[in-house]
């Protein structure tokens, strides 16, 4: 554990230089690379620059940045100066940014050039905000990061911070409600780097590529904390990743570790290039998190590329991965075992511990737990209970300690008096060759009884026989997981509703169903809550 007097930036940046890695490449983006020594020099100049802008220790600055080498410069530069970077999603609307900037009371916003118009709209007349700085080219009189840093001839000394000082914020994406500012302390990155780093097996000579972005907790741990914790190299990709761009990046940089979300792995398998493309010879491990990995995606990946995908679980509140498959013992359909350094519990509705082979809410204890939510005392007390952090996820634990995801606490429902996991039905549907994605919710039949309803995205579009497809999928699910769990209705969608971080928004599907919205062939394709009812009568 870090000492009481501790600055995370000194540990992750200065230490690498002191240990002889000053000339080693820390980050690579499409435009340039940055050695650990160059990173240290740039990071040291950020504090004096922020001071000239009127930002004081413990103030907050907002980062709305693409994944380029400027991200670690500003992130660690602020932390080194005792200033708190607030990492914001780059895919939001002006109203959403305004809420986050008001809530965080950020003094300065650093935004990649293409985001300036929406940030300027969001920031109009905000009382706490002093200025907006462009990262990249921008027309006068907009201030530019490169020019401001160039005027700083000498770096400043690191701030006198302690391990329990707030280091950075991220906002929980959530699937409902307003985002919450999750506050992490200076000691948290080191805990994440050591715990998750050991489980994944990071090495100093690794080249890491994370398709998950740095503003996400998953991406921040993958591409920043874990590789920097051991002195490895990260490849950054600034644009939104696609199957094509990931294949290109793998071919160009030949990484040893690949991190992505299940949706991207599925998209890569569905892309025509997957039939001819090979993975880099030196690629050692593929990791998935951000949402549960469907077993069929993992199996298809193994069959096509000869690599397993390690399924991992983390959260914004815990910072990074706390539960994963063991890299040498992947078991698809499960979430694996706790990462060393974390303890897990399953509890029932009254907070009592549940036995093996029962379903309960997952609680986590570990040194990377957030300090709480900003200005959300009631929600902080509900989520952070003593040493335990409530995840809101339902899990099943076997006697051998292996955990399996069952859904969110408000997703589980009973059919014929038996608890049903929507995720289990979704996995069964996605194991069928014609189904790319699936979401399952409870719906009432004509007798008022609860039955599963499925929404699916087809693997390939074209003419279908609705009745035949429904019968085919129904029998497939019944044979896979049980005769009472099959969906009584199936609806085809162009896309499933998701948050900007890729999490499925089942509540929107529930609202549509409860609202009595009947989708038809003539319904609009946007928003994505309309599609074709394939078949089903609730029986």
UniProtKB/Swiss-Prot annotation:
Q: What is its EC number?
A: 6.2.1.25, 6.2.1.27
- Molecular function as annotated in GO: 4-hydroxybenzoate-CoA ligase activity; ATP binding; benzoate-CoA ligase activity
Does the record's keyword annotation contain Cell inner membrane? Answer: no
pH dependence of activity: Optimum pH is above 9.
Output the PTM entry. Answer: The N-terminus is blocked.
Domain of life (superkingdom): Bacteria
SUPFAM superfamilies annotated for this entry? Acetyl-CoA synthetase-like
Alphabetized UniProt keyword annotations: ATP-binding, Ligase, Nucleotide-binding
**What catalytic activity does the UniProt entry give for this protein?**
4-hydroxybenzoate + ATP + CoA = 4-hydroxybenzoyl-CoA + AMP + diphosphate; benzoate + ATP + CoA = benzoyl-CoA + AMP + diphosphate
Q: Which NCBIfam families match?
A: benz_CoA_lig
Family according to the record: Belongs to the ATP-dependent AMP-binding enzyme family. Benzoate-CoA ligase subfamily.
What protein name does the entry list?
A: 4-hydroxybenzoate--CoA/benzoate--CoA ligase
Q: State the organism named in the record.
A: Rhodopseudomonas palustris (strain ATCC BAA-98 / CGA009)
